[in-house]
Amino acid sequence: MEVIKITPRGYCYGVVDAMVIARNAALDPSLPRPIYILGMIVHNKHVTDAFAEEGIITLDGENRLEILEKIDQGTVIFTAHGVSPEVKKRALEKGLVTIDATCPDVTKTHRLIEQKLADGYDIIYIGKKGHPEPEGAVGINPERIHLVETIDDVERLSIHNERIMVTNQTTMSQWDVADIMAKVKEKYPHVEMHKEICLATQLRQEAVAEQAKEADVTIVVGDPRSNNSNRLAQVSEEIAGTKAYRVADVTEIDINWIKDAKKVAVTAGASTPTPITKEVIDFLEQFDPNDPSTWKRERKVPLQKILPKVKTKKEE
């Protein structure tokens, strides 16, 4: 079996930055304890488990404001997905120390939205309902920011404003965003369009669209809650025309998916730890459909290998 290692794949700079920020917090004795992460720092359970080993508590719930109410003292880290101004204000009121690990691309979209709102615009925001990134963006002004996920959602919009802007969650499928933006333009011809797919997402999607074409099946290594991982599987099927399966790690691979394949493509979401992806690639490279001894799928990556290394200050 040939394994096509799709490039680029895996970690993006926003994810690495967020994890480094959180690791540095864990190593800083001056920060008040406990240290909490408001939601999953990035959407990957291996990462949150690794942070738990370092004494950082991940709290999850329906929305960021609700999670925040569970915290009475200590330090709170905002995740890479960003938070609304209301969450920041409430954390301040509660006297918590806050650390912002928001991805710079998400911050850029927030700034754009704030500027357009100040100029009197209504905002149409294309995003995944229930995902924390749209929650943070829409939370800037829920009255004037309209969340849409599908073309049907656009049909249901009723905005009476000459000033309208459309933008999007940074990890959406660029093809879905283009289709939805076209529908918005059809309904509101005067709309101002700002496509905000981050470059890392765009490059990874384009790599799958092109490189997965030759494969019989694509394996996407990523957490079930990772929107960008799920979109990579979607791109493989809808754009490259190759059946795709998303797995959290090597243990989730079904032999039936790969036993008849001559070529298997592998990619990984932007929040997937590199050692987890390597384990999948190593398994596929040694797999022989005629030799059951090669079928064993076992995760052996230790938690201490999951997080990126950080430089610690040497004592003088």
From Swiss-Prot:
CDD domains: lytB_ispH. The active site is at residue 133. (2E)-4-hydroxy-3-methylbut-2-enyl diphosphate binds at residues 43, 81, 131, 170, 226, 228, 271. Binds 1 [4Fe-4S] cluster per subunit. PANTHER family: 4-HYDROXY-3-METHYLBUT-2-ENYL DIPHOSPHATE REDUCTASE. One of its GO terms (biological process) is dimethylallyl diphosphate biosynthetic process. InterPro entries: LytB/IspH. The keyword Iron applies. Catalyzes the conversion of 1-hydroxy-2-methyl-2-(E)-butenyl 4-diphosphate (HMBPP) into a mixture of isopentenyl diphosphate (IPP) and dimethylallyl diphosphate (DMAPP). Acts in the terminal step of the DOXP/MEP pathway for isoprenoid precursor biosynthesis. Its cofactor is [4Fe-4S] cluster. One of its GO terms (molecular function) is 4 iron, 4 sulfur cluster binding. Isopentenyl diphosphate binds at residues 43, 81, 131, 226, 228, 271. It catalyses: isopentenyl diphosphate + 2 oxidized [2Fe-2S]-[ferredoxin] + H2O = (2E)-4-hydroxy-3-methylbut-2-enyl diphosphate + 2 reduced [2Fe-2S]-[ferredoxin] + 2 H(+); dimethylallyl diphosphate + 2 oxidized [2Fe-2S]-[ferredoxin] + H2O = (2E)-4-hydroxy-3-methylbut-2-enyl diphosphate + 2 reduced [2Fe-2S]-[ferredoxin] + 2 H(+). Belongs to the IspH family. Keywords: 4Fe-4S, Iron, Iron-sulfur, Isoprene biosynthesis, Metal-binding, Oxidoreductase. The lineage of its organism: Bacteria, Bacillati, Bacillota, Bacilli, Bacillales. Pathway: Isoprenoid biosynthesis; dimethylallyl diphosphate biosynthesis; dimethylallyl diphosphate from (2E)-4-hydroxy-3-methylbutenyl diphosphate: step 1/1; Isoprenoid biosynthesis; isopentenyl diphosphate biosynthesis via DXP pathway; isopentenyl diphosphate from 1-deoxy-D-xylulose 5-phosphate: step 6/6. Its EC number is 1.17.7.4. This is 4-hydroxy-3-methylbut-2-enyl diphosphate reductase. Dimethylallyl diphosphate binds at residues 43, 81, 131, 226, 228, 271. [4Fe-4S] cluster binds at residues 12, 103, 198. The keyword Iron-sulfur applies.
